[in-house]
């Protein structure tokens, strides 16, 4: 049973006011975004970049997905190096990627022990992926939810063709992919050498 001395709710036709002698309630207006309606074959939703500095991984990631026909790469950004951001903005300017600012939650309370970000899993990754899903689900035929260190190589040289082949079987519940871990020391990394030495096999 609620105590009417603590909180009183007054209903009106146009607004609702909350009155309390104990708790101050802040009301924030949530931004409203329209869903993308442009028809796209394949879109990727990339987990938020946080304190990101590994440019070798990032630009290899973007170029490989571009090469195999990804229509749009929606990259969520919390924080990256300034020079990396400048290059990303050039990619966005030419329509290759979409940059989505993704800020950490602010602490409304002055108590430093209370941090809402500590209650979020993987820097609020799930919320970013859900936003991307609702933004593109009416537009894209296929949506990839991926991290910046994950590169999917299609067998037909086209993501869209691969996914279409997979969906022809209506009695399959899930798919498994061969997974390889590759790592090159940053001091030995050459961007052009990466593309010259990699070969795609069936």
Language-model region placement:
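Active-site-proximal specificity loops/subdomain of glycosyltransferases
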Residues: 32-43, 50, 81-145, 154-156
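Short, acidic, metal-binding catalytic loop of nucleotide-sugar glycosyltransferases
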Residues: 61-72
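Catalytic-site signature of metal-activated, phosphate-bearing donor transferases
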Residues: 1-31, 39, 122, 126-130, ...
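Acidic ATP/Mg2+-coordinating residue in the GHKL
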Residues: 77-78
């Amino acid at each position: 049973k609620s105590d009417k001395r603590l909180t009183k709710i007054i209903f009106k036709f146009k607004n609702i006011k909350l009155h309390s002698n104990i708790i101050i309630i802040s009301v924030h207006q949530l931004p409203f975004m329209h869903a993308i309606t442009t028809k796209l074959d394949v879109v990727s939703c990339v987990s938020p970049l946080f304190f990101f500095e590994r440019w070798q991984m990032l630009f290899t990631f973007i170029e490989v997905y571009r090469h195999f026909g990804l229509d749009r790469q929606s990259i969520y950004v919390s924080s990256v190096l300034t020079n990396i951001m400048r290059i990303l903005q050039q990619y966005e300017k030419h329509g290759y990627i979409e940059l989505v600012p993704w800020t950490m939650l602010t602490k409304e309370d002055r108590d430093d022990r209370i941090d809402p970000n500590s209650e979020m899993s993987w820097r609020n990754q799930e919320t970013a992926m859900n936003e991307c899903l609702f933004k593109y689900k009416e537009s894209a035929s296929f949506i990839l939810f991926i991290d910046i260190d994950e590169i999917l190589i299609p067998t037909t040289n086209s993501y869209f063709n691969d996914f279409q082949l997979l969906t022809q079987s209506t009695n399959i519940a899930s798919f498994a992919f061969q997974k390889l871990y590759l790592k090159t020391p940053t001091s030995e990394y050459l961007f052009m050498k990466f593309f010259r030495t990699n070969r795609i096999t069936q």
